[in-house]
């Protein structure tokens, strides 16, 4: 059996699909389905069982044996960067992951967990070392502190990998609302008004020229499954493309896709409106991120990553296919 926590969420449900593509269906999904819309992410997936997050945590804290477990993909977390209830965030992100680490290492079960590029704060260096880490919100701090906890462990004999996700976009993120990717929001904006809204310049960048390392979720899944295939690899690794691209690049890729749809597609769609940069984000907004991918490449992962010119059209085509169902 393989356990996927957060398995009804964005990245978790895509990992489930990736496992299904390999013919693997002996999967236990762990999640919090108070937002029942997330079940739609699993409607076309095959799994063996579901367990509520709180029930799962209680069982691993008491050391319950859940049978033969091949690996745990831990994607479950409070991922909102605007959540300031520190007790809640630390319980869900930090204490939960600590308990899962102890449970897995005691049983020598491989654990591949989601960290975050947010641990680097404003950057400008995005490399897996303490000197470059300066979290700016509770979410980032909870991820950072667990990475520190892992670094302090001695004598772990099984695989443990933390993946610092950069800006992930792609299918099955619609439940995330305001926390969904800009590609998702641009799709909605172009459908509604034919225009994309971007922030004006900030931190020395021109309008829409703030740059992020945007990575398609299919590439994220590919790395997770490669790690599953290579249990000798452990450590904390960045997971982006290694190339920063601007929000304008994402907008242009979306506009180009809409314009290519023909008569009912994007003839009238394609404007970009630049809106004032919000005061509440000043000093808290990453205007530039770019993963240093040296560590993961050195570990042996050599596949190419999609750029936004490839990944965004693929994603918008998927969204359009969902609208027609």
Swiss-Prot record:
Functional pathway: Nucleotide-sugar biosynthesis; ADP-L-glycero-beta-D-manno-heptose biosynthesis; ADP-L-glycero-beta-D-manno-heptose from D-glycero-beta-D-manno-heptose 7-phosphate: step 4/4
Gene3D superfamilies the UniProt entry points to: NAD(P)-binding Rossmann-like Domain, UDP-galactose 4-epimerase, domain 1
Subunit relationships: Homopentamer.
Annotated cofactor note: Binds 1 NADP(+) per subunit.
NADP recorded as keyword: yes
Protein name: ADP-L-glycero-D-manno-heptose-6-epimerase
Domain of life: Bacteria
EC number: 5.1.3.20
Needed co-factor(s): NADP(+)
Binding-site residues for NADP(+), renumbered to this chain: 10-11, 31-32, 38, 75-79, 143, 168, 176
GO molecular function per UniProt: ADP-glyceromanno-heptose 6-epimerase activity; NADP binding
Record gene name: hldD
Active site annotation, chain numbering: 139 (proton acceptor), 176 (proton acceptor)
Annotated InterPro entries: Epimerase_deHydtase (IPR001509), Heptose_epim (IPR011912), NAD(P)-bd_dom_sf (IPR036291)
Keywords: Carbohydrate metabolism, Isomerase, NADP
């Amino acid at each position: 059996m393989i356990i996927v926590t957060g398995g009804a969420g964005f990245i978790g449900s895509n990992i489930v699909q990736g496992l299904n593509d390999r013919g693997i269906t002996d999967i236990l999904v762990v999640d919090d389905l108070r937002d029942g819309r997330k079940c739609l992410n699993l409607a076309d997936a095959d799994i063996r069982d579901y367990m509520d997050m709180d029930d799962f945590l209680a069982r691993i804290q008491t050391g319950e044996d859940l049978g033969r477990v091949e690996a745990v993909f831990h994607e479950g977390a409070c991922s909102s960067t605007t959540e300031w209830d520190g007790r809640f965030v630390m319980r869900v992100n930090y204490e939960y992951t600590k308990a899962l680490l102890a449970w897995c290492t005691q049983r020598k079960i491989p654990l591949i967990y989601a960290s975050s590029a947010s641990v680097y704060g404003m950057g400008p260096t995005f490399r897996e070392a303490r000197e470059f880490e300066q979290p700016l919100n509770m979410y980032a701090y909870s991820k950072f502190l667990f990475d520190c906890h892992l670094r302090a462990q001695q004598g772990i004999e099984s695989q443990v990998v933390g993946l610092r996700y950069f800006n992930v976009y792609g299918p099955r993120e619609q439940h995330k609302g305001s926390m969904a990717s800009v590609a998702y929001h641009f799709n909605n904006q172009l459908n509604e008004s034919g225009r994309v809204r971007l922030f004006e310049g900030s931190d020395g960048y021109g309008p829409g020229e703030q740059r992020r390392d945007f990575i398609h979720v299919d590439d994220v899944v590919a790395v997770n499954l490669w790690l599953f295939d290579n249990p000798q690899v452990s450590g904390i690794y960045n997971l982006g493309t290694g190339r920063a691209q601007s929000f304008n690049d994402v907008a242009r890729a979306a506009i180009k896709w809409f314009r290519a749809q023909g008569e009912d597609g994007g003839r009238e769609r394609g404007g970009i409106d630049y809106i004032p940069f919000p005061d509440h984000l000043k000093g808290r907004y990453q205007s530039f991120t770019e993963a240093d991918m040296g560590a993961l490449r050195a570990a042996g992962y050599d596949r190419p990553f999609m750029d936004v010119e490839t990944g965004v059209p693929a994603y918008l085509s998927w969204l359009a296919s969902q609208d027609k169902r």
